[in-house]
A protein has these predicted regions:
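Metal-dependent phosphoesterase core characteristic of DEDDh/y 3'-5' exonuclease domains
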Residues: 76-80, 87-112, 133-264, 269-271, ...
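Short acidic, Gly/Ser-rich segments with clustered Asp/Glu that frequently serve as metal-coordination loops
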Residues: 61-74
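Short His-Asn-centered micro-motif
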Residues: 64, 122, 143-146
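Short, basic and Ser/Thr-rich N-terminal targeting/leader segments
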Residues: 57, 62-64, 79
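Metal-dependent phosphoesterase signature
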Residues: 112-122
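N-terminal accessory regions of nucleic-acid-interacting proteins
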Residues: 1-59, 232-289
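A short, well-structured juxtamembrane/interface segment
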Residues: 44-52, 120-132
């Protein structure tokens, strides 16, 4: 199904990517064989047809992405309009529109995907802010240029609990850019395309892609941070119920999954996400039978 190549990089690290020089291996997925794009994206991003209760728990790692609209006379000001959070497996924890306090002068639909009707009955900023704060509290927060999201939410998060894929040195070196875009990393690391040209962005897809990139890098990231003991990616608890005023990922119709896929060898899979890959492939094959 997929294999990974490792690029050894000398890099600096902090909680979100910087301080102590060390050797890191950047994991890059390389796809082999014939696999339709839809199935490949589902396996990479994490969109199980019938997710198990374990995959629906919030767990210790969550990824966030926000969409903004324009406010002010020329629409140059930014206001939060949508927030999406996914867990380690890519399962949607929260996906909601947000009603801005200021009058929206530019919905930026071409990139945000937000329309006037989406915000009419959306919850208030304060309501969403409190919900997000509750979800991320005590958890490792993954994001891409995550300070933009935290700034939009008027929230802070402990630096040791932040993983910013835009600031991770091995990924910067892989892309040849100090500020690599999520679209670029998804193509380079995951082998899939998001934020396609002239298509609206989806904060759910962006959050899933960010988590997918992080999954492939987690082991190297932990080594750079000097985390000796592996943190569990999930915890015990009841399955969450996603409450959303936004359209999230669609379900796959029964009978669509026909081709079985084989599990890559341990050497071929990203070590940081080996268990995750095994579960996803098993779920895929179960649906195919």
């Amino acid at each position: 199904l997929a294999k990974s190549i490792q690029a050894s990089k000398s890099s600096d690290s902090t909680a979100s990517g910087t301080h102590e020089t060390s050797q890191a291996q950047t994991q890059v997925l390389q796809w082999e064989g014939v696999l339709d794009e839809k199935t490949k994206r589902r396996l990479v991003l994490g969109e199980p047809v019938n997710p198990s209760p374990a995959k629906q728990t919030i767990g210790n790692y969550v990824a966030i992405d926000c969409e903004m609209v324009g406010v002010g006379p020329r629409g140059t000001g930014n206001a939060l309009a949508r927030v999406s959070i996914v867990n380690w497996h890519g399962h949607v924890v929260l996906d909601t529109f947000v009603k801005p306090k200021e009058r929206v002068t530019d919905y930026r639909t071409w990139v945000s995907g937000v329309r006037p009707g989406d915000l009419k009955k959306a919850p208030s900023f304060a309501t969403v802010q409190a919900r997000v704060a509750d979800i991320i509290k005590g958890r490792v927060l993954v994001g891409h240029a995550i300070q933009n999201d935290l700034r939009a939410l008027l929230l802070s998060h402990p630096r040791p609990k932040i993983r910013d894929t835009a600031g991770f040195k091995p990924l910067q070196e892989l892309s040849g850019n100090k500020s690599p875009g999520l679209r670029t990393l998804s193509k380079l690391v995951l082998g899939i395309e998001i934020q396609k040209h002239k298509q609206e962005h989806s904060s759910v897809e962006d959050a899933q892609a960010t988590m997918a990139v992080f999954r492939t890098q987690k082991r190297a990231w932990d080594e750079l941070l000097g985390i000796a003991k592996k943190e569990p990616v999930s915890n015990t608890g009841t399955a969450i119920t996603t409450t959303s005023s936004a359209a999230t990922t669609g379900s796959t119709k029964k009978g669509q999954l026909k081709r079985r896929v084989s599990l890559p060898s341990m050497q071929a899979r990203p070590k940081a996400a080996a268990a995750w890959w095994e579960e996803e492939v098993q779920d895929y094959n179960a649906q195919a039978t």
